[in-house]
Amino acid sequence: MWTARRILKDLADGDHRRKILTAFWRFGDEQMKAVAIVQLARAMHFRDETIRKMAPEKKAELLAGRVGSPEFEQTFENALMLYHTHEQSEMLGAFLDQWGVPHKNGSIEVDDYTPPAVDAVREAVRKLDAYDRRDVAIYLAAAGLLMTGAWRDATWPVVDELAPALRPA
């Protein structure tokens, strides 16, 4: 099972983890960020205001230090979503085009579409080999996590195939 914490620990290297968690602080809504600030302050015995004043990159670094903490799972899920929709929309669009899923800049904006089957996911990974394999694995794991159901059934087996070669050092 690919949780947000597992994706960040097992698939993302330090650079990807930093980019993903920085995206949370740059693109997240104020309520999401406020919850994360309170959680970080509590976990680190800091005042909320101390964390609030930090640069997004520093707050991302603090979050990265909590990647094993279950109480941050929702924050990490939001970070993955924000990273992909803001920083990886071109790659999302390329995969969605391969699967015939209507989208706008990588964001699915309709309810009436058929999620890809596992063979279609494998074929898209093969065809779109110009994209970094780590980026692809993180995307597919996050898609299965965030979209659930048929998406999970189609993407996670492919992530399981890609993951052994991507374990961070």
Regions from the PLM with identified roles:
Residues W2, R6-L11, M54, V101, ...:
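Short, aromatic- and cysteine-enriched interfacial helices/patches
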Residues A163-A169:
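Short, charged, intrinsically disordered terminal tails
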Residues M1, F95-Q98, A169:
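N-terminal low-hydrophobic presequence detector
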Residues M1-V35:
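Charged, amphipathic alpha-helical stretches
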Residues A23-D153:
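Acidic, low-complexity, intrinsically disordered interaction modules
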